[in-house]
């Protein structure tokens, strides 16, 4: 069976997108029983697959879309800001048209995506209304990080769990090691600079590991 994939990235966060409305051997994918978890693991693996941080399943029509996200390790994810923008670009490509506002239903609820600018045939600038940020309790196994109690830490939800830790030197932190200690959250480390009004951030994504975004 030949399934068409498109490969996208948002800020270096890479995703494969499958339009489940496509017809293969006379039947649309959405009507088939396909093990998408196994497909995500195989396709996202850089050794033998295309390599990506996750697999996005697209459904819907026109400016109304639905998104299902499966991480590279096969685990589900409720939401991704970069992922949803990649999904919308794939939807535009499938429809051969663009819409100024797109409604995307995710496992974290409805998200609104706005087309800011069409840069060229391969690039778009899209903004996402991510919804309210709400506080979360300290995640399970947080003590494994052995954080200094004076270090600034926030546990937050944007539909999926994030923990943000302020550090002095972002390059001195072994983020891969820390992320593997708390694999059920998205772990971000931040430090001031390089400009006075900027911060630098690195991310260890739940189910995906270190990403470029």
What label would you give each PLM region?
Residues 1-122, 163-213:
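A glycine-rich beta-to-alpha transition motif near the start of alpha/beta enzyme domains, typified by
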Residues 87, 132-134, 157-160:
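Contiguous hydrophobic segments
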Residues 106-109, 123-135:
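Membrane helix-loop-helix hairpins that form the core translocation module of multi-pass transporters
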Residues 127-129, 153-155, 200-202:
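Active-site-proximal beta-strand elements of phosphoester/diester hydrolases
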Residues 133, 137-145:
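A short, surface-exposed loop/turn module that caps and links secondary-structure elements
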Residues 142-174:
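Internal active-site segments that recognize and position negatively charged phosphoryl groups
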């Amino acid at each position: 069976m030949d399934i068409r994939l498109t490969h996208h990235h948002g800020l270096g966060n890479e995703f494969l997108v499958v339009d489940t409305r496509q017809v293969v051997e006379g039947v649309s994918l959405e009507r088939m029983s396909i093990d998408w978890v196994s497909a995500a693991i195989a396709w996202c693996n850089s050794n033998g697959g295309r390599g990506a941080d996750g697999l996005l399943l697209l459904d819907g029509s026109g400016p109304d879309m639905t998104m299902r996200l499966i991480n590279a390790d096969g685990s589900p994810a409720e939401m991704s800001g970069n992922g949803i923008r990649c999904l919308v670009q794939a939807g535009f490509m499938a429809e051969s048209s663009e819409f100024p506002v797109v409604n995307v239903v995710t496992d974290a609820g409805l998200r609104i995506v706005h087309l800011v600018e069409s840069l060229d045939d391969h690039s778009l600038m899209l903004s996402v209304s991510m919804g309210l940020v709400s506080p979360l309790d300290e995640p399970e196994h947080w003590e494994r990080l052995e954080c200094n109690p004076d270090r600034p830490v926030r546990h937050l939800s944007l539909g999926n769990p994030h923990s943000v830790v302020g550090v002095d030197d972002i390059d001195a932190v072994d983020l891969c090691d820390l992320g593997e200690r708390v694999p059920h959250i998205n772990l971000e480390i931040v430090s001031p600079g390089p400009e006075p009004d900027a911060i630098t951030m690195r991310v260890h994504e739940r189910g995906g590991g270190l990403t470029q975004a």
